[in-house]
């Protein structure tokens, strides 16, 4: 790659915040964005189910490599859980496994429903939904389920920082209970699993009927654009400098230290903890660096030598 084309790639590198509609898969969204943005180097920081809407954080060009360091950020969701019906996918698109009787549902109080959701808060062990993208012996769990296999994934630790029940409404036609919730959780949490587990705890079954992701780390859906808006203006939401500084605390470096990082060299530690965005006086975010022992080494170089 010559220097001119390298600079062109860097100028096109960054993050696009997209408001995903219900229907397409995250893979479908990437395919559409490749056409809109005019590059195949497109990737996202976390899958949204087809039925889900909301924030999809998309990396463009070198932004795809940057997003690998953002996937562990916490997330926020708004969702509707239907209590009274369990499905094999834990959402409305799955086959019905069980339906609670009207008598059992009418016996539940709103206080019991709220307490069952409250029990999900904090550091918990959660069993991922069987139709997740988690791989088992090289194959994704949802593919195995579609092939007819009985998939039960092991529990793993997640953190529910907050879970608020916004309202509880009874569907008069079915006696099912719809609970609208707001969740702030760690990466790797399955909201469908919360619906399933609350339904099981109440003895009536439960599944997800609506899901909207409202934030990923420092990125909020209020900044996101629809595919139609991006068709009209296929521009970055944040360039690479802006994205790195938003996601990470910074370490101020000299221009010469910036050159060293661009060449793959390490810097002297200054007592920082965690990953930092190394930023020059001119405002360029050169790399993400992390101190270990007597070195501050780069974990991602945004501007390799020749891309300045």
UniProtKB/Swiss-Prot annotation:
Q: Does the keyword Kinase apply?
A: no
Gene3D superfamilies assigned: Pseudouridine synthase, PUA domain
The positions flagged as active site in the entry are: 49 (nucleophile)
Name the Gene Ontology biological process terms. mRNA pseudouridine synthesis; tRNA pseudouridine synthesis
Q: What is its EC number?
A: 5.4.99.25
Q: Which UniProt keywords apply?
A: Isomerase, tRNA processing
Which reactions are catalysed by this chain? Answer: uridine(55) in tRNA = pseudouridine(55) in tRNA
What Pfam families has UniProt attached to this entry? TruB_C, TruB_C_2, TruB_N
Show the InterPro entries listed in the entry. Dyskerin-like, PsdUridine_synth_cat_dom_sf, PsdUridine_synth_N, PUA-like_sf, PUA_sf, tRNA_psdUridine_synth_fam2_C, tRNA_psdUridine_synth_TruB, TruB_C
The GO terms describing molecular function are: RNA binding; tRNA pseudouridine(55) synthase activity
Q: Which domain of life is it from?
A: Bacteria
Q: Which SUPFAM superfamilies match?
A: Pseudouridine synthase (SSF55120), PUA domain-like (SSF88697)
Q: Its family?
A: Belongs to the pseudouridine synthase TruB family. Type 1 subfamily.
Q: Which NCBIfam families match?
A: TruB
What is this protein's function? Responsible for synthesis of pseudouridine from uracil-55 in the psi GC loop of transfer RNAs.
**The protein, known as:** tRNA pseudouridine synthase B
